C-alpha cells in the first residue's frame, strides 16, 4: 500500500528541507523522483542540490538526462517514472500522479504560509484517504525536528 507523507513547511524553505529528506531516502536504498510544477523550478533545484553543502554529494539529474534510468534521483516536471523510483516527492503544489499507487511512498511537501498550497494539500489529503492510502502529517517542533502529528 502506498504511504503518503505530508510535510508542512512553516518558516522554512523547500531548499533547506529537501536535501536532508533526499539523503535519508538514498540511505534507505530508495530511488526518487522529485516533481515540481515548472522547468525553471526544477532547474533551480538542480543547481541547489549540487551546491547546498560543501561536504556532501547528492547524485541526481533532471528528466532531460540521457541516462535518467540510471540516476538515483530525478528532478521532473511531469508524471512518469524514468528511474523506476520507489518514492515520489511532490513540491510546489505538484498534483498527485495518476500512478500514485505504483510508489511505496509519496512525499507531499507544502508551504503552510501559502493559502493556495495549504488548500491543495488539504485536497490531496482527502483524495489520498479516499484512495485508501496510509497518510501521515509531519510538522517541525520548536527545535526544528520533524514530528509526526495526529
Label each region the model flagged.
Residues 16, 83-98:
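An N-terminal amphipathic alpha-helical segment
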Residues 105-150:
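Glycine-rich, aromatic-bearing surface loops/beta-hairpins
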Residues 21-24, 48-52, 106, 123-127:
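Short, solvent-exposed amphipathic alpha-helical segments in soluble enzyme
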Residues 1-47:
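Long, hydrophobic N-terminal alpha-helical segment
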Amino acid at each position: 500500500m502506498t504511504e503518503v507523507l505530508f510535510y508542512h513547511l512553516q518558516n522554512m524553505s523547500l531548499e533547506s528541507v529537501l536535501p536532508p529528506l533526499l539523503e535519508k531516502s538514498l540511505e534507505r536504498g530508495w530511488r526518487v523522483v522529485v516533481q515540481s510544477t515548472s522547468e525553471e523550478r526544477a532547474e533551480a533545484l538542480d543547481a541547489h542540490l549540487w551546491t547546498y553543502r560543501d561536504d556532501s554529494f547528492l547524485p541526481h539529474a533532471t528528466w532531460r538526462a540521457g541516462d535518467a534510468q540510471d540516476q538515483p534521483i530525478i528532478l521532473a516536471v511531469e508524471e512518469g517514472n524514468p528511474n523506476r523510483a520507489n518514492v515520489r516527492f511532490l513540491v510546489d503544489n505538484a498534483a498527485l500522479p495518476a500512478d500514485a499507487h505504483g510508489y511505496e511512498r509519496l512525499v507531499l511537501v507544502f508551504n503552510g504560509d501559502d493559502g493556495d498550497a495549504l488548500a491543495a494539500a488539504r485536497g490531496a489529503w482527502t483524495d489520498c484517504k479516499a484512495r485508501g492510502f496510509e497518510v501521515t502529517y509531519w510538522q517541525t517542533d520548536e527545535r526544528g525536528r520533524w514530528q509526526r502529528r495526529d
